[in-house]
Amino acid sequence: ILKKNGNIIIHVEAKISHHIRYICDKIFGEARFKNEIIWKTGGNAKNKNQLGRSHDNIIVYSKTNKSKFFPMYKPYDIEDVEKFPMCPHHNMRYGNSAAHTCHPEVNPRPNLRYTWNGHYHQWLICEEKMKSLHEDNRLVYNKKGIPRIKRFFEEQSGIPIRDLWDDISSIQSKEKTNYATQKPIKLLNRIINLYSEKGDLCLDPFAGSGTLGRSCINNERKYIFY
């Protein structure tokens, strides 16, 4: 059923996630494991014998190495951005990232080894690109004269969404259908947009509250319920 460029997403409690991964490793192969996402659900239940559970696990496997994946980003917090320096040449605030690798032996690239500003390294960009960035005031130099690359916030997509999701709250009252394990629509929206595109077909073999169907309609996907 799963297409070659498809993904399978399995939502489980932490206590059985290792069983699911073991089964999926056998079916798809360990190399097809993509992520085990931690979704913070809250939870106030007291437990005298162990720590209380406050998250669910979302396990993602692909059928092949051609699976669909569309990175998503969260907007930068304005207050956080304002803590970074302003570049007077571009009138934009920026962070910075390394311009050279600290472990060239891991991935030797002789064509990227050259001397810049008196420092010989294996750089992450070619000498021509380094010169271009320097001339455009897109390099910042530390006290030793080693360059780092300016990353202007206005030119970035935002903060990449990673495998810890603590920004989606549990089901809202207006969404409730009195189904015990109903998932919030925001959660399904994120999953669908990460792993599929418009017109794709999504399968929910359990259906449950039908939230996946609502999300598919909202995001222009087709869906099948069993």
Question: What role is predicted for each listed range?
Answer:
Residues 1-226:
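Core catalytic lobe of class I
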